[in-house]
Design a protein with these regions (language model features):
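N-terminal Rossmann-like NAD(P)+-binding subdomain of aldehyde/semialdehyde dehydrogenases
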Residues: 1-137
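Conserved small-residue-rich beta-alpha loop and adjacent elements
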Residues: 123-187
Length: 187
């Protein structure tokens, strides 16, 4: 297996970490170097600004159903490359069955959230909460509670034990809710 430097997806592009601060990721099978990773040199404040100013508005322009289809597309992309992921998973010491729970379980989580989003949420930008409520005695003034995406960004830190599924179970509801995410994988 060829050693690769893992890239960081930030600012809508793949960015290599500063090579002077990379960490080695050895194989649990034979100790050989599988990959190198690092986030040195990344502008984390800029990443949050980008999430708030670019990612958030782009997600909020989408309806719940559009975001659900985006999540399904991510699940399909993972399934299309699952054999590559199984090969990498093996290097962590996981059996194929272990990897199945992580990889295909992660994709299944995306499919589940996508399905729930299309079945249980409207093809709209807001979610109505309850009935109209009269706010005046005569009924000339009423109110309606709604749910809308939060402003800002979610920051998720992933664990070692399920590197795919663990990240995706956090990412799916975040995206469905219309909130951009910054994810720190275990390394």
């Amino acid at each position: 297996m060829k050693t690769q430097q893992l890239l960081n997806y930030a600012f809508d592009q793949w960015i290599a970490g500063d090579t002077s601060s990379l960490s080695d990721l050895p194989s649990a099978i034979d100790g050989s170097l599988v990959a190198r990773t690092g986030s040195g040199g990344l502008d984390f404040g800029g990443m949050l600004r980008h999430a708030r100013e670019k990612g958030g508005p782009a997600l909020r322009k989408m309806t719940f159903h559009e975001r659900a289809r985006l999540i399904k597309g991510l699940g399909l992309a993972i399934m299309a490359r699952k054999e590559e992921l199984y090969e990498l998973s093996y290097q962590t010491g996981a059996t194929r069955k272990d990897g199945w729970i992580d990889i295909e379980g992660g994709a299944g989580t995306l499919f589940s959230f996508s399905s729930k989003g299309r079945r249980e949420l409207p093809d709209a930008h807001v979610l109505l909460d309850g009935q109209l409520e009269p706010l005046s005695k005569s009924g000339s003034f009423v109110g309606q509670h709604i749910h809308v995406p939060l402003q800002g960004a979610a920051v998720h830190i992933n664990a070692f034990n399920f590197p795919v599924w663990g990240m995706l179970e956090k990412l799916a509801p975040t995206l469905l809710a219309g909130v951009p995410a910054i994810i720190k994988p275990a390394s």
